């Protein structure tokens, strides 16, 4: 059986409602649909920067769907160390979810779900196409002020290094079975063409990357 439907949600930023009734949050964000039981739910990042709320939300919606696929966005890591967040959140997922696939930190995973290959990752961006753009992104985005990695400040060069590894892994997965039905899930936009002209500027490299050739 091939998955009939994919339902997508992202950028819910539930931390703004921390402490609110989780059932009401679920109802507000994902009103029931008659097709849910035959659907794969894709949660493409920026769901909540609070691990317990994040996993509580997913554990509540999980029973309605055939499967859930989740990747963090950049905001999940706000006011956290990425390495610590990954460890704590993985433990919560293992304890409280049954049919959720998740790629945390710099992971890129490929899971076959109902004869569809889901390749999923946050896919951090390269930070821009040149040093000037990378400098502008570093100065403008809060990511590089309130996220840490291994006890040190997260930086654009560190993000760019992660991006190169993640992008290469996605490419390898796609080439390994080009005839498969592939769905690639990322938080950051996989093409600069997806940036609205209204927002076209030198910091687009903090939100999108050049994945047109993949």
Map each language-model feature to its residues.
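Active-site-proximal loop/helix segment associated with metal-binding centers of metalloenzymes
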Residues: 119-184, 188-209
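Glycine/small-residue-rich loop that forms an oxyanion/phosphate-binding "nest" at active or ligand-binding sites
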Residues: 82-104
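Glycine-rich phosphate-binding loop signature in dinucleotide/nucleotide-binding domains
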Residues: 33-37, 113, 173-180
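Short, Asp-centered acidic motifs that coordinate Mg2+ and/or phosphate
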Residues: 6, 40, 100-101, 116, ...
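N-terminal active-site segment of His-dependent metallophosphoesterases
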Residues: 1-71, 76-84, 146-153
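Short acidic low-complexity segments
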Residues: 34-36, 101-112
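Beta-strand-turn-beta hairpins that frame and shape the catalytic cleft
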Residues: 1-7, 109-120
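Short, solvent-exposed loop/turn segments at secondary-structure junctions
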Residues: 13-14, 48, 75-77, 110, ...
């Amino acid at each position: 059986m091939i998955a009939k439907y994919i339902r997508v949600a992202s950028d819910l930023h539930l931390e703004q409602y921390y402490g609110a009734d989780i059932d009401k949050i679920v109802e507000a964000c994902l009103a029931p649909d008659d097709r849910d039981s035959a659907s794969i739910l894709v949660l493409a990042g920026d769901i909540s920067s609070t691990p317990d709320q994040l996993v509580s939300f997913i554990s509540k919606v999980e029973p309605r769907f055939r499967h859930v696929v989740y990747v963090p966005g950049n905001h999940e890591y706000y006011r956290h160390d990425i390495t610590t967040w990954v460890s704590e959140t993985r433990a919560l997922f293992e304890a409280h979810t049954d049919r959720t696939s998740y790629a945390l930190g710099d992971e890129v995973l490929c899971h076959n779900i109902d004869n569809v290959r889901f390749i999923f990752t946050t896919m951090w961006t390269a930070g821009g196409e040149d040093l000037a753009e990378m400098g502008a992104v570093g100065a403008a985005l809060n990511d590089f002020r309130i996220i840490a990695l291994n006890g040190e400040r997260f930086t654009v060069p560190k993000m760019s290094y992660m991006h190169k590894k993640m992008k290469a892994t996605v490419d390898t997965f796609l080439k390994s079975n080009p005839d498969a039905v592939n769905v690639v899930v990322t938080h950051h936009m996989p093409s600069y063409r997806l940036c609205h002209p209204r927002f076209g500027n030198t910091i687009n490299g903090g939100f999108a990357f050049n994945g047109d050739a993949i």
